[in-house]
A protein has these predicted regions:
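General N-terminal targeting signals
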Residues: 41, 45, 53-54, 185, ...
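Glycine-rich and small/hydrophobic secondary-structure elements
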Residues: 272-289
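Short amphipathic alpha-helical segments
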Residues: 20, 29-36, 160, 164, ...
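Structured, mid-chain assembly/scaffold modules that mediate subunit interfaces
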Residues: 1-144
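Extended, charged amphipathic alpha-helical segments
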Residues: 128-275
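Surface-exposed beta-strand edges and their flanking turn/coil or helix-capping segments
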Residues: 83-88, 120-123, 183, 237-240, ...
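Hydrophobic transmembrane alpha-helix bundles
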Residues: 94, 221, 288-289
Length: 289
């Protein structure tokens, strides 16, 4: 499923802010701009949304401006009540830190114009409070493909993608089990005397030389080998699952490692990625960049 996320994320690019009246670019440059956008978009594609907690940073800029801190929080560690019109939060909650046992150590509760930070040792009283003039929370959602029913969007890893990945894993496991049989095809011997010593199956498989004698009637035993199982059915099933996964995600079989004997032309490659290009264009609009 990482292919479905990474191939789309690689096509998203942040160019900057237009009509930057409020100097967003200055605040953005204070928060590791080289990886901030990629981190936020990748998190939103995986969990359908992520959140950016805006707080005051320590110290001031050389120009005397207050430092602003942007903290990315994945969708599994934050939630809130979303405004149907602006798609911003009117109330939000975010986990800030966890211990080694995944227990919550600190969290933030956000309301319009106010952010309160709590810790597990003192859950009833905030240890820090920030106030500001805004009709919305300082917890800002970044949502991928929202709709009227699912306002917090859809994950790039759909249920169909997960089902195809599980089917592919089962196919690979079956092929590994079958490999033990077609690597050592089963053998047989007929016409042995009733008094002949029975061979241990493991000893017979691993021995370099075996001795068979004629029976009491002078007949020689007949040795044979069953036809080895083929890996082809497993490979064909895996390729069929890959085709369904590619159709679900807008990828091509080449993207998934199934290369054809005749390389595709530039036009064919472009046509194969047309669906992914449209998905990336839609994602750009969803993220408002």
């Amino acid at each position: 499923c990482s292919k479905a996320v990474d191939n789309l994320a690689d096509r998203l690019q942040f160019d900057g802010f237009e009509d930057d009246t409020f100097e967003f670019q200055t605040m953005f440059d204070q928060n590791n701009p080289d990886i901030f956008f990629d981190d936020a978009m990748l998190s939103a594609l995986i969990s359908s949304c992520c959140f950016v907690l805006v707080t005051r940073g320590a110290g001031k800029m050389p120009e005397g401006q207050q430092r602003i801190r942007f903290q990315i929080i994945d969708g599994s560690n934050a939630t809130g009540i979303i405004d149907d019109y602006t798609k911003l939060l009117t109330e939000g909650y975010a986990v800030l830190d966890r211990d080694e046992n995944d227990n919550v150590k600190s969290w933030a509760y956000c309301t319009p114009g106010r952010t309160e930070v709590y810790v597990a040792e003192q859950p009833d009283k905030p240890i820090a409070v920030e106030t500001f003039d805004s009709p919305y929370c300082a917890l800002v959602p970044i949502i991928y493909r929202p709709d009227a029913k699912r306002q917090f969007g859809h994950s790039r890893i759909s249920r169909a993608c997960m089902d195809y990945a599980k089917s592919a894993m089962r196919t690979i496991k079956r092929s590994e089990i079958a490999a033990e049989f077609y690597s050592f095809p089963q053998k047989y011997a007929t016409g042995l005397s009733d008094d002949a010593e029975m061979l241990n199956s493991w000893h017979a498989s691993m021995s370099a030389m075996l001795t068979f004698t004629k029976d009491e009637d002078g007949e020689r035993p007949t040795l044979g080998q069953f036809q080895a199982a083929s890996f082809t059915p497993h490979l064909e099933q895996l390729k069929a699952i890959a085709s369904m996964f590619a159709g679900e995600t807008g990828l091509t079989l080449d993207d998934l490692g199934f290369f054809t004997s005749n390389p595709s032309s530039a036009e064919a490659i472009k046509a194969g990625h047309e669906g992914l290009r449209l998905t990336a264009t839609k994602a750009q609009r969803c993220f408002s960049v």
